[in-house]
């Protein structure tokens, strides 16, 4: 029995001397069960050290418990190839498993450090994402933003005016009365009363006014400092906008029926028509200039430039609105959603006029949207390229009679600009209709040329346009 077992063991172990030893044991007839075994010249068993020299193989610690223990990342996925399900058992979390599997299954795509200029890399499946520092952009953060800034993209980062030409870096400029700061994009005032600023708010560390003029609010005193009130024979005529100490912009249709030009007065710093508070300044209008293309009784080219008899004095309550450069107005200001209109017009259609200056925040519309909305109520207004629509179609808010000629003022990065002139509309705050404004950007060069030219005789002049 022992002999058979020994032979089987020898065969399994493949030991040549083992069988011979077995034969000796059998021949001697010794039974290990009956008497103690003594070492002899032929041994069946070897020492542990000798056995290890023949049978030794590497084993993982606790290998016999492998199926009983929770998964180990080292054991399952690094010593051996693991599956997604095995990795999921290890992490116990789908998101962490996905992050591991991306790197495990196709390698770390960030290993080559593809992100430049200090960018950080995030590994993805067969891809990667670079998170760039603020001054850089591109797939690998390889491009400095300053090298790619163009004026059509957020005004090139400029606070006011932007210029660029093919093959050159964009440059920022500032309006008259401002200077460019060292950062190359910001503008700072160089005069006490620069255009487009509201001194009352500046001193309160605020930036925008609180706030037709149907459904609007009272413009707090001093918060619409460029607003002009035009009077003829002492009666309210229209509104206007101060653009420097001697020039005012208004609507041409306001002067269709004027006969006594010497009684045309512009009032600055006005707020409440029922009282005089000492901040008002009155100037006689010396000249009214309208485009040669304007036809009385119509709405196209509805703009007028007024020269005052004497310059006004700039104060906290009398400040000009900036007349923007044309490209800046068309490329940037035209896409500012909301702007302010102001005036002392009727508070309701055919109602009483306002005693206090009113202001309203109105949204600007694309011309096509304006036409589509108007057609829904059976109207087909003639909106030319010299006009634009703004306001609300629900009949709640609008400019109205008496507001004509007043400003449509647009705020951009801390400064206000003249973008429109209150012109015409179908009634006041009529459902389905919008207010129509003269598009000032079309007349920038015309206005600037007239303001640079020598005064000509006459009160009402027609100047060639364009």
Curated annotation (Swiss-Prot):
Changing residue 304 to V: In FA7D; Malta-II. Keywords: Blood coagulation, Calcium, Cleavage on pair of basic residues, Disease variant, Disulfide bond, EGF-like domain, Gamma-carboxyglutamic acid, Glycoprotein, Hemostasis, Hydrolase, Hydroxylation, Pharmaceutical, Protease, Repeat, Secreted, Serine protease, Signal, Zymogen. Changing residue 342 to G: In FA7D; results in severely decreased clot formation in coagulation assays. GO terms for biological process: animal organ regeneration; blood coagulation; circadian rhythm; positive regulation of blood coagulation; positive regulation of cell migration; positive regulation of leukocyte chemotaxis; positive regulation of platelet-derived growth factor receptor signaling pathway; positive regulation of positive chemotaxis. The active site is at residues 253, 302, 404. Substrate binds at residue 398. The modification 4-carboxyglutamate is found at residues 66-67, 74, 76, 79-80, 85-86, 89, 95. Pfam families: EGF (PF00008), FXa_inhibition (PF14670), Gla (PF00594), Trypsin (PF00089). Plasma. Residues 61-105 form the Gla domain. Its main location: secreted. Its EC number is 3.4.21.21. The record marks 212-213 as: Cleavage. The record marks 113 as: Important for S-112 for O-xylosylation. Glycans are attached at residues 112, 120, 205, 382. It is found in: Secreted. Initiates the extrinsic pathway of blood coagulation. Serine protease that circulates in the blood in a zymogen form. Factor VII is converted to factor VIIa by factor Xa, factor XIIa, factor IXa, or thrombin by minor proteolysis. In the presence of tissue factor and calcium ions, factor VIIa then converts factor X to factor Xa by limited proteolysis. Factor VIIa also converts factor IX to factor IXa in the presence of tissue factor and calcium. This is Coagulation factor VII. It comes from Homo sapiens (Human).
